[in-house]
Amino acid sequence: MPVRRIGIGVAADGARVQESARKAGIDSRVIFYAKPGLLDAGQDFGIEEGDEPWKMLVGDLYAGKIDAAVRGTLPSGATLRVLREAAGVDHLERAALLEDGKGRRFLLAPVGIDEGWTVVDRVAIARRTKDLAGILGLEGGVAILSGGRLSDAGRHPRVDESLAQAELVARLTGFPHFEILIEDAAEECSVIIAPDGISGNLVFRTLALLGCGQGHGAPVLNIDRIFIDTSRASPSYANAIRL
């Protein structure tokens, strides 16, 4: 299905969001969802205003008025809560499309701090992220990470637990366990599954916000609409709009 209309949320720094839409350079029409008086969209873009723009953005996505949505600078808690309710799911699973300093692109999951805390969660996330990689044309396998090398067993109970869980995820999915060696995983794979959501979030922030890499947004995996989550700390949302 062609994506003709893309909505993006604006709660702060409207100029940055507008500039991102201009830099995206896409044929799709971009529509801003913001509180009244926050910005002037001009002739190039549409604008929908309301006191709760996150509800409008998600509502229009599920009503078919827009074909895809980007969170932009809308608050995470309120926006994702409304999205969960509209999608009829009790949790969301996200995978971030990242690019390192060498220009290599890969998907990283889980990246939400409340995601990926059980073996069942990570098995589901790994399989869905692999499917997304295929849609995006990313070649390479799936790497399961843990909190140490197998030879580190016995050094700390949490390390032991992380190793055991990663081994189980690897066995259930058939994907290789790369232990803690994320550098090797990035060389060989297009999908990296972190030990938990906090680890994944830290990897994302280190690469995209401190290092030489960049983020392209984080599609939500377990809903039937296109919704790209973003970090409010991102310098631009052009990549997420293109995605």
Stretches found by the model and what they are:
Residues 1-185, 189-190, 199-243:
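Anion-binding alpha/beta catalytic cores of soluble intermediary-metabolism enzymes, centered on
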